[in-house]
Amino acid sequence: MWMKNLTDKLMVWVVLVLIVSTLSWAGEVKRCIVCGMDLSKYPHTKYVVTTTGGEEFQTCGAQCGLTLHLRLKEKFKSATATDLLSNRSFDAQKGFYVYKSTVITDMAPGFISFATRANAEKFQKGFGGKVVTYQEALEIWKEQMK
């Protein structure tokens, strides 16, 4: 028998408890529903899409959020984005986006979210790109995905 005494059994039990507790402590990594990136690395670009059925899906940023919007079609209800400068959530459809700046926050070529045109333009002055509305961003991304 491979475990001859109580000490061997106890050691195996302790090791198993440590392994199981470590795995449960580490938890499961939450990933972007579109690209699979670790969401804990992108709190500054958090983007959440809500469906007409009430389901919420978090993406790493606006680009994956726009992708999900296009995939959901009529099941898309709303989205919230995070303003890169203020770090506040806002209604994504009322926001402004800088497309193709020199900064890549989550995905390339990149749409970076801003709650106000002023924040988007302030960012654009330093890092380039094009300031667009949500609808314009959606149309640009629809063309890029063809």
Labelled PLM ranges:
Residues 56-57, 111-112, 129:
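A residue-level structural signature of the nucleotidyltransferase/glycosyltransferase Rossmann-like core
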Residues 13, 28-33, 83-87:
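Short acidic/polar alpha-helix capping motifs at helix-coil junctions
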Residues 50-54, 103-108, 124-125:
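Short glycine-enriched loop/turn motifs at secondary-structure junctions
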Residues 12-22:
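Bacterial N-terminal signal peptides
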